[in-house]
């Protein structure tokens, strides 16, 4: 913390923030803390506040526990900003405002007023919120609502003023003076609570607002567009801060059912301790990075690399790529991955494809009144009694006779109902009275029950009506959808194309699996594993073989992959070895945009993701680590979701379930994806996750029979291991 009179410059530390969730249900693990986790995302977003999360905690609705945490974070941790979420309503246990009033030394009523005014323009129920904002020492404390939607909107309302407020509390004289000088230069004051001037040093926070909604309130297009009426005199959230771009998938962030109060940090950022959130796209995505554009002719013409391999002594001793959190890496992959174009296919080839058009029924189903059961078509008005049988109606035939009073017609399931009949009586509710001498015909039957009109008859169009949309655009087709296409007679459909994936392994030490081992050599397993993983999901593949650790060979192999495939996957050559040239070839020769080159995760630290735009067509490049386990884990984490998005699947994220640990598991400083086998015990709702043993990234045996990845949070001072029986999140990677 700055002392009295200290001048802070633009190079001083970031805003240190604590997020405190006040909720009995979240504290007891009966509910997920979606609002608290979402606030952490917003705080850390560089396009918004750009702060760091220095503390995060969940407490019950108890005044003393709330006060104790607030005082500790203000006086001991010396945070700049504390955001509380929850406990601000009218319920008997909503006591957050009372606890806050006992802690603060000065109130900040303007911020509470801004939140109330903004909330009232969203819903009249905003008047039921009782937020308190105030200052203790040099810490600003703000009470936000407990819902994810409400807390995010209120954060948006006060966001434009937060940086300047914190600068004032930190005695950041330089920044404070800059803002004051710019305010003095304005010709007239802005309307109340309008955004600061466009020349404000915090303009990026004005231009990037947040508008999120709960999952149940999301719009069908999965983007939440707030309507802004420029003619209105009311103060709205949009008038205070503009909405940032919609995320790729509008979904809430999940959290592990445990309170991870202390977050571990990397040299460049603070990854979330909650494991599940690593694979949930946050509501506020990172800014889009424009890929470099190249000409296909120029790219494919180059056969000699410009990478200088002679100056070995001048190679990097430390990676030039910053550590990227799993959250940010996953979001970046989905943001930069395009959805491919469409093609027309025969419906029989539609398994696993995604419809690019709505499919409508050409005919009614059934096209005639059809019997639901085997029995007799009757006139309901006749009631019970003996009836003459005038013939039969079978499936596939149209009866020509009309049922008159005192008559019935024998029918089979699915057969057309004859004229004159308006009900079906099942055979079990009848007795045969008379038959032909040879027993080949039924002549008279006794109806034992009173039938009602329409009984056991499917009317015309009962199942499907002509013109009805039977399959919507975006449907991921399986066996039932193929059958439905056949039912309605649609034999050709428009679908998104499948991405073509080219795979190669790199390394001078590699041999093909069929080769005999030579000194210093090993057989290449990565290529076989990656090809099988991609093929298991149904995507066409190209085998580019083994490529030596030579820039020219790498360039030529990449050029071949670029010319033939939509996605190129490499393994090896991305770490810090003197022969690891792949990233240099991508950058120097191909002019690809490398979006990240290191990910804060285990295994898979050197995972690299790049894009290359050639004549308006985007190529996706995944440069995966060379260790076998790292390659297959990162393929499941990054490559498979990207391929699913390319083929048009609306939610490409992997399936994540809850499971119980079968043994104690030690935590690593990095978020870890621990291989496991999921099994269900008799009458237990949750599966058990059994570790596959030694998790060394070179040990492919740890993937044997594995159908899940334990999503383990990073180690903290409070939590160094998880114990047998604890519930964890598991990403499904195989058949259950």
From Swiss-Prot:
<feature type="modified residue" description="Phosphoserine">
    <location>
        <position position="262"/>
    </location>
</feature>
<keyword id="KW-0500">Molybdenum</keyword>
<dbReference type="GO" id="GO:0097112">
    <property type="term" value="P:gamma-aminobutyric acid receptor clustering"/>
</dbReference>
<keyword id="KW-0628">Postsynaptic cell membrane</keyword>
<dbReference type="GO" id="GO:0008940">
    <property type="term" value="F:nitrate reductase activity"/>
</dbReference>
<dbReference type="GO" id="GO:0032324">
    <property type="term" value="P:molybdopterin cofactor biosynthetic process"/>
</dbReference>
<feature type="modified residue" description="Phosphoserine">
    <location>
        <position position="268"/>
    </location>
</feature>
<keyword id="KW-0547">Nucleotide-binding</keyword>
<dbReference type="GO" id="GO:0042802">
    <property type="term" value="F:identical protein binding"/>
</dbReference>
<comment type="function">
    <text>Microtubule-associated protein involved in membrane protein-cytoskeleton interactions. It is thought to anchor the inhibitory glycine receptor (GLYR) to subsynaptic microtubules. Acts as a major instructive molecule at inhibitory synapses, where it also clusters GABA type A receptors.</text>
</comment>
<dbReference type="GO" id="GO:0072579">
    <property type="term" value="P:glycine receptor clustering"/>
</dbReference>
<feature type="region of interest" description="Disordered">
    <location>
        <begin position="181"/>
        <end position="232"/>
    </location>
</feature>
<dbReference type="GO" id="GO:0005102">
    <property type="term" value="F:signaling receptor binding"/>
</dbReference>
<feature type="region of interest" description="Disordered">
    <location>
        <begin position="260"/>
        <end position="290"/>
    </location>
</feature>
<feature type="modified residue" description="Phosphoserine">
    <location>
        <position position="270"/>
    </location>
</feature>
<keyword id="KW-0472">Membrane</keyword>
<dbReference type="GO" id="GO:0061599">
    <property type="term" value="F:molybdopterin molybdotransferase activity"/>
</dbReference>
<keyword id="KW-0449">Lipoprotein</keyword>
<dbReference type="GO" id="GO:0098982">
    <property type="term" value="C:GABA-ergic synapse"/>
</dbReference>
<feature type="region of interest" description="MPT adenylyltransferase">
    <location>
        <begin position="326"/>
        <end position="736"/>
    </location>
</feature>
<dbReference type="InterPro" id="IPR036135">
    <property type="entry name" value="MoeA_linker/N_sf"/>
</dbReference>
<feature type="modified residue" description="Phosphothreonine">
    <location>
        <position position="198"/>
    </location>
</feature>
<dbReference type="GO" id="GO:0007416">
    <property type="term" value="P:synapse assembly"/>
</dbReference>
<keyword id="KW-0770">Synapse</keyword>
<dbReference type="Pfam" id="PF00994">
    <property type="entry name" value="MoCF_biosynth"/>
</dbReference>
<dbReference type="InterPro" id="IPR008284">
    <property type="entry name" value="MoCF_biosynth_CS"/>
</dbReference>
<dbReference type="GO" id="GO:0007529">
    <property type="term" value="P:establishment of synaptic specificity at neuromuscular junction"/>
</dbReference>
<comment type="function">
    <text>Also has a catalytic activity and catalyzes two steps in the biosynthesis of the molybdenum cofactor. In the first step, molybdopterin is adenylated. Subsequently, molybdate is inserted into adenylated molybdopterin and AMP is released.</text>
</comment>
<dbReference type="GO" id="GO:0099091">
    <property type="term" value="C:postsynaptic specialization, intracellular component"/>
</dbReference>
<feature type="modified residue" description="Phosphoserine">
    <location>
        <position position="188"/>
    </location>
</feature>
<dbReference type="GO" id="GO:0014069">
    <property type="term" value="C:postsynaptic density"/>
</dbReference>
<keyword id="KW-0963">Cytoplasm</keyword>
<keyword id="KW-0597">Phosphoprotein</keyword>
<dbReference type="GO" id="GO:0046872">
    <property type="term" value="F:metal ion binding"/>
</dbReference>
<dbReference type="GO" id="GO:0005737">
    <property type="term" value="C:cytoplasm"/>
</dbReference>
<dbReference type="InterPro" id="IPR036688">
    <property type="entry name" value="MoeA_C_domain_IV_sf"/>
</dbReference>
<keyword id="KW-0067">ATP-binding</keyword>
<keyword id="KW-1003">Cell membrane</keyword>
<keyword id="KW-0564">Palmitate</keyword>
<dbReference type="GO" id="GO:0043546">
    <property type="term" value="F:molybdopterin cofactor binding"/>
</dbReference>
<feature type="modified residue" description="Phosphothreonine">
    <location>
        <position position="266"/>
    </location>
</feature>
<dbReference type="GO" id="GO:0006777">
    <property type="term" value="P:Mo-molybdopterin cofactor biosynthetic process"/>
</dbReference>
């Amino acid at each position: 913390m700055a002392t009295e009179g200290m001048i802070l410059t633009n190079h001083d530390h970031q805003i240190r923030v604590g997020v405190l969730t006040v909720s009995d249900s979240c504290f007891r693990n009966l509910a997920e803390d979606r609002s608290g986790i979402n606030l952490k995302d917003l705080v850390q977003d560089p396009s918004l506040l750009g702060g760091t999360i220095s503390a995060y905690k969940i407490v019950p609705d108890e005044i003393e526990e709330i006060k104790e945490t607030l005082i500790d974070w203000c006086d001991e941790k010396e945070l700049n900003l504390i955001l509380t979420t929850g406990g601000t309503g009218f319920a008997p246990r909503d006591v957050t405002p009372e606890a806050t009033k006992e802690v603060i030394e000065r109130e900040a009523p303007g911020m509470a007023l801004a939140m109330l005014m903004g909330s009232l323009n969203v819903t009249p129920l905003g008047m039921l919120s009782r937020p308190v904002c105030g200052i203790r020492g040099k810490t600003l404390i703000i009470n936000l609502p407990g819902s994810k939607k409400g807390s995010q909107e209120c954060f948006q309302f006060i966001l434009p003023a937060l940086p300047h407020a914190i600068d004032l509390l930190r005695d950041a004289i330089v920044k404070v003076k800059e803002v004051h000088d710019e305010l003095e230069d304005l010709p007239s004051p802005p309307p109340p609570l309008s955004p600061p001037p466009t020349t404000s040093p915090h303009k990026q926070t004005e231009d990037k607002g947040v508008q999120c909604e709960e999952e149940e309130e999301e719009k069908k297009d999965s983007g939440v567009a707030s309507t802004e009426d420029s003619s209105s005199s009311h103060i709205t959230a949009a008038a205070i801060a503009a909405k940032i771009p919609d995320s790729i998938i509008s979904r809430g962030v999940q959290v592990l059912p445990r309170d991870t109060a202390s977050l571990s940090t990397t040299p460049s950022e603070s990854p979330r301790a909650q494991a599940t959130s690593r694979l949930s796209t946050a509501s506020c995505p990172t800014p889009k990075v424009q890929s470099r554009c190249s000409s296909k002719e120029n790219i494919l013409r180059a056969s000699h690399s410009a990478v200088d391999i002679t100056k070995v002594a001048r190679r990097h001793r430390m990676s030039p790529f910053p550590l990227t959190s799993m959250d940010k890496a996953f979001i970046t992959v989905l943001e930069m991955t395009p959805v491919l174009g469409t093609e027309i296919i025969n419906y029989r080839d539609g398994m696993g494809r995604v419809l690019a058009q709505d499919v409508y029924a050409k005919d009614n189903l059934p096209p005639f009144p059809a019997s639901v059961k085997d029995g007799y078509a009757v006139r309901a008005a006749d009631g019970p009694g003996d009836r003459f049988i005038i013939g039969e109606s079978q499936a596939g035939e149209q009866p020509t006779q009309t049922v008159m009073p005192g008559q019935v017609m024998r029918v089979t399931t699915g057969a057309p109902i004859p004229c004159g009949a308006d009900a079906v009586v099942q055979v079990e509710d009848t007795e045969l009275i008379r038959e032909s001498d040879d027993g080949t015909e039924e002549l008279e039957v006794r109806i034992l029950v009173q039938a009602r009109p329409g009984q056991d008859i499917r009317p015309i169009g009962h199942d499907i009506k002509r013109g009805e949309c039977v399959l919507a655009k975006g449907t991921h087709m399986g066996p039932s959808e193929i059958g439905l296409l056949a039912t309605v007679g649609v034999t050709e459909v428009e679908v998104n194309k499948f991405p073509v994936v080219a795979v190669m392994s790199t390394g001078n030490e590699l041999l093909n699996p069929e080769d005999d081992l030579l000194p210093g050599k090993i057989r290449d397993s990565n290529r076989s594993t990656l090809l099988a993983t991609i093929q298991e999901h149904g995507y066409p593949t190209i085998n580019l073989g083994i490529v030596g650790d030579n820039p020219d060979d790498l360039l030529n192999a990449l050029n071949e992959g670029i010319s033939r495939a939509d996605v190129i996957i490499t393994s090896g050559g991305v770490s810090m070895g003197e022969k690891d040239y792949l990233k240099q070839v991508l950058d120097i020769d191909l002019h690809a945009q490398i979006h990240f080159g290191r990910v804060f995760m285990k295994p898979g630290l050197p995972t690299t993701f790049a894009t290359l735009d050639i004549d308006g067509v985007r190529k996706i490049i995944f440069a995966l680590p060379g260790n076998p386990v790292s390659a297959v884990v990162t393929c499941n984490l990054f490559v498979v979701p990207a391929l699913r998005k390319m083929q048009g699947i609306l939610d490409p994220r992997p399936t994540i379930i809850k499971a119980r640990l079968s043994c104690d598991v030690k935590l690593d400083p990095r978020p870890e994806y621990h291989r496991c086998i999921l099994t269900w015990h008799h009458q237990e709702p949750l599966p058990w996750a059994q570790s596959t043993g030694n998790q060394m990234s070179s040990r492919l045996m740890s993937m044997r029979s594995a159908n899940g990845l334990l999503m383990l949070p990073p180690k903290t001072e409070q939590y160094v291991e998880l114990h047998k029986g604890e519930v964890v999140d598991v990403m499904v990677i195989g058949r259950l």
